[in-house]
Amino acid sequence: ERFDVSSKVGYVFKDMPYQSIGFQNAFNSHNQKSYFGLNQYNIKQSSFYSNLIFNSIISNTMHKFATGLNFTYDKYQEFVNVNDYSRIDNSVGAFFEYTYDNDSNFSLVAGGRVDNHNRLGTFITPRLHIRYNPWEKGVLRVSAGRGKRSANIFAENQPLFASARTFEILDTNGKIYGLDPEIAWNYGLSFNQKFTIFERSA
């Protein structure tokens, strides 16, 4: 059983097509009752998401930025056999992203966000993307960023309920399911060169 509803409104400022403001909202409800042999898994989730974003430029269109606020709310009524893992999660966040593009051979996107979560506290997630064309048909890309999330360990691994395995959570000092959140630092570097062999692109 699932229900979804969403809304999106925006406004582009008169005589300033590069400047706009948008407001997004979404609500969904999901109710699932499952039996895997002798294992029973029931979950009812209600989620709300709201996002306010403002886009504009700095001096000229080579320098753009986006900033805003968002709010998320998740209520879980989750039962694994006789164990109750129900909880309520909510967070408030603010973000800022700057984009530079010289419309020729270089672009940069740098941003970050600050979130305050009722269980995970306050944390920062930055990110950076760079694209450079040193010569014709050659592209160098560099990226880096940080991510943090709390996994829904049962909902994301439901096929395991069909096995004969038992479930034990060994750590109990974390904030969600007794576990700490997943934290990942991601880095990327690539170079792509297009050329022609025997009049064919390669």
Predicted regions and their residues:
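Outer-membrane beta-barrel signature, preferentially recognizing the C-terminal barrel domain
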Residues: 1-4, 8, 133, 137-139, ...
